[in-house]
Regions:
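Structural recognition of the beta-strand scaffold that forms the well-ordered cores
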Residues: 8-11, 29-32, 77-81, 98-102, ...
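Conserved H-X4-D acyltransferase segment
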Residues: 1-23, 165
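Solvent-exposed loop/turn segments at secondary-structure junctions
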Residues: 13-16, 34-37, 77-78, 83-87, ...
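Extracytoplasmic substrate-binding proteins
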Residues: 87-166
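A structural signal for short loop-to-beta-strand junctions that line the ligand-binding cleft
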Residues: 3, 48-61, 99-112, 116
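Extracytoplasmic
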Residues: 2-5, 23, 62-65, 86, ...
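A short, structured surface patch at a secondary-structure boundary
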Residues: 15-69, 73, 77-79
Length: 166
């Protein structure tokens, strides 16, 4: 649909990307339980409080969906991984469009994914803004490569990175 009003997003990382492109999550009606857990433990809880009551029973952590439940919920778009072709056919048979996307394996793949989601969500301008920002940022850092390479060991900045993965 040109302007999806009720989206189900079984693919784990895509709810965050949908939010980033739309600027809200008001039209997301179902996300996987693991994505909901991620929402609870992140800044998205403050940015997208509308996800507090989102359904987590129609889509599963293994990307599978309850086709009948999605139809009953009047879902008008499903965003999922390209490995879910059988489910996509079932959804299409019920009149529910399904956009299947590839998991990004590199930054070019991620930019393609953002562009494809922008097209599906009617957020093409925002998707272009995101990919342009990435290109500009990479150009900036690449322009500093020679400068950084010329630094001595003592001049190199030190960074400590903490990461908590559940």
């Amino acid at each position: 649909p040109a302007h999806p009003k009720r989206i189900a997003v079984p693919a784990m990382v895509l709810p965050n990307m949908v939010y980033a492109l739309q600027g809200n999550a008001e039209n997301m009606v179902s996300i996987p339980p693991a994505a909901y857990s991620g929402w609870e433990m992140s800044i998205l809880k403050d940015l997208a409080p509308e996800l507090e009551d989102v359904d987590t029973t129609m889509v599963n952590d293994d990307f599978s969906v309850n086709v009948e439940a999605l139809a009953d919920a009047d879902v008008d778009l499903v965003l999922n991984w390209d490995s879910e072709t059988d489910q996509a056919e079932q959804l299409k048979a019920l009149g529910i469009p399904c956009v299947l996307v590839s998991s990004a394996k590199d930054m070019d793949g991620l930019k393609s994914l953002v562009t494809m989601l922008g097209d599906a969500l009617n957020c093409e301008d925002r998707a272009k803004q995101v990919t342009d920002w990435y290109d500009e940022t990479m150009d900036y850092f690449n322009s500093k490569a020679d400068e950084v390479a010329a630094l001595s060991e003592d001049e190199m900045p030190r960074v400590l990175h903490f990461q908590n993965v559940h």
